[in-house]
């Protein structure tokens, strides 16, 4: 099982522009779209990505990636994720980030597949979310948190201390692998 917590906050902006689409099935499949103010992305394209993610439980990850690529070709900042209690597969482009806390160490996740173990923690987020954080903050909050929600709360408190959540949209997902559940 993958415990997860999703944050979507408009920050100091008039509207929330990023998108997170999720499919909960035997594996958790997700698309995170980072839309800075200057980015243009149509509602129809957004709906197409959402529909593909919703139908993705019967697709291989590479097929999903190939299906969304023509839609997202002009959007420079996005991430596709498929995670279960054994592996995570990521495809990220632009200013979106994925980190894993494994055996007390923080590492940036590369594109492709990575093995997971019980208790591993993963954060996927936009560049705006990362702006006020550093590796030590992410790692220390991950190791002291008992849940994905608590980890997110701790990170948001750090961001709030720096900018009172008054700047851009904040989008992130924290995940904890719970193999025994």
Model-derived regions: residue spans:
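Short, contiguous clusters of charged residues that form electrostatic/catalytic patches at enzyme active sites
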Residues: 66, 124, 153
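Catalytic core of PPM/PP2C metal-dependent serine/threonine phosphatase domains
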Residues: 47, 53-101, 159-179
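Active-site flanking residues adjacent to catalytic metal/cofactor-binding acidic residues
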Residues: 33, 124-126
């Amino acid at each position: 099982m993958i415990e997860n917590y999703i944050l979507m906050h408009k920050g100091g902006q008039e509207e929330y522009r990023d998108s997170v689409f999720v499919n909960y099935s035997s594996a958790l499949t997700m698309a995170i779209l980072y839309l800075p103010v200057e980015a243009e992305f149509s509602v129809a394209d957004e709906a197409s990505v959402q529909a593909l993610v919703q139908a993705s439980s019967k697709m291989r990850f590479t097929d999903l990636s190939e299906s969304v690529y023509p839609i997202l070709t002009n959007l420079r900042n996005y991430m596709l994720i498929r995670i279960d209690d054994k592996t995570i597969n990521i495809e990220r482009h632009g200013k979106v980030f994925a980190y894993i806390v494994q055996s007390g160490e923080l590492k940036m996740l590369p594109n492709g597949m990575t093995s997971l173990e019980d208790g591993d923690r993963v954060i996927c987020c936009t560049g705006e979310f990362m702006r006020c954080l550093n590796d030590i903050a992410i790692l220390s909050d991950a190791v002291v948190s008992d849940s994905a929600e608590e980890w997110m709360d701790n990170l948001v408190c750090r961001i709030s201390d720096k900018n009172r959540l008054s700047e851009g949209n904040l989008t992130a997902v924290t995940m904890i692998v719970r193999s025994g559940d």
